[in-house]
Regions:
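Noncatalytic, solvent-exposed loop/strand surfaces
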Residues: 1-307
Length: 307
């Protein structure tokens, strides 16, 4: 499901029916529109789940499905459209459906919004929507998978872009400052690529120079972010994983659907610090704010802290 975002004054919420709503922090509605009314009916196989991302005063939506391939920028103050661009792709069948979320990043003078789906990871100019670069061959034509819909989202950290694909296929890591044009395997700016081993649903985690890929079955693949060298692979809990891992204070937290929370020490070697369990089911990713951990279960919302 889509995750809310906030600038500290307003909270922005997106629903599976396409409602995009802004509230003030007291819960008063400021503006609203429906993305299906504005941009056409959704045609997703499994519903609309993409988060609307807030970046430098604007909201960015990716609407990637069988009836539309759009990226949209909206003014966060008014809800009015700033720009809309068509996101070109040659993907077919189920690949046309993206359940991933865009991400946005500023690195010095470089600002970028990254959309993900329909076989490509694409960087856009936030001011205009113009395509700056695209990571290609995530679903190679010589062994094309017509069901390779993207669910895991790209991440940006320490100047690296991590672009996952799906279903244990490939992942690409690109240096953001060098990204340019069409980036195939070994292309401009690409640091490394592996042809298999990506996550399917959970998003990658890049933390302190190490890339963590949490598989759906509770296996973590740990790689050197600069070189792609495998550091370790361990199955730490045999359960279903939907929520993405998070990092804090030198630790990595993994959330299993059965309510088991596994804590690993961050670093290049495997070290299990502990496990805890709550009597609930979890498919959402944890959120961390002001020394508190927030967990959204099927039954309850939990806040966990030292006080």
């Amino acid at each position: 499901s889509a995750t809310p975002s906030s600038d500290g004054e307003k909270v922005f919420v997106t629903t599976g029916t396409g409602e995009v709503v802004a509230f003030d922090v007291s819960g008063n509605e400021k503006w609203r529109f429906n993305a299906q009314d504005r941009y056409g009916k959704f045609r997703f196989g499994f519903g609309f789940h993409s988060t609307t991302v807030l970046h430098e005063g604007r909201l960015f939506l990716q609407l990637i499905h069988s009836a539309a391939q759009l990226v949209v920028s909206v003014d966060s103050t008014t809800g009015k459209e700033v720009w809309k661009v068509e996101r070109k792709s040659d993907g077919v069948a189920e690949c046309e459906h993206s359940y991933a979320s865009p991400t946005a990043h500023r690195q010095g003078d470089l600002s970028v919004v990254i959309t993900h789906g329909n076989d490509y990871c694409i960087g856009h100019d936030p001011a205009t929507g113009k395509e700056l670069w695209r990571i290609a061959d995530l679903n190679p034509k010589d062994r094309y998978n017509r069901t390779l819909r993207f669910v895991a989202s790209p991440v940006v950290s320490n100047g690296f872009v991590v672009a996952p694909s799906a279903k244990n296929r490939g992942v690409s890591v690109v240096r953001l400052a060098e990204a340019k044009g069409r980036i195939g395997k070994g292309g401009v700016g690409e640091l490394w690529r592996m042809d298999k081993g990506t996550t399917d649903v959970t998003s990658p985690l890049l933390y302190e120079g190490v890339l963590y890929l949490c598989k759906e079955n509770g296996t973590v693949l740990c790689l050197d972010a600069k070189t792609g060298e495998q550091l370790y692979q361990e199955r730490f809990h045999g359960q279903t994983y939907r929520g993405s891992p998070v990092a804090f204070n030198g630790r990595i937290l993994f959330t299993a659907r059965d309510g088991t929370f596994t804590l690993l020490k961050a670093g290049k070697s495997y070290e299990l610090l502990g496990k805890n369990k709550l009597d609930d089911e979890f498919t959402a990713s944890p959120a961390i704010s002001r020394d508190r951990l927030y967990l959204r279960g099927y039954k309850y919302l939990y806040a966990i802290g030292t006080k």
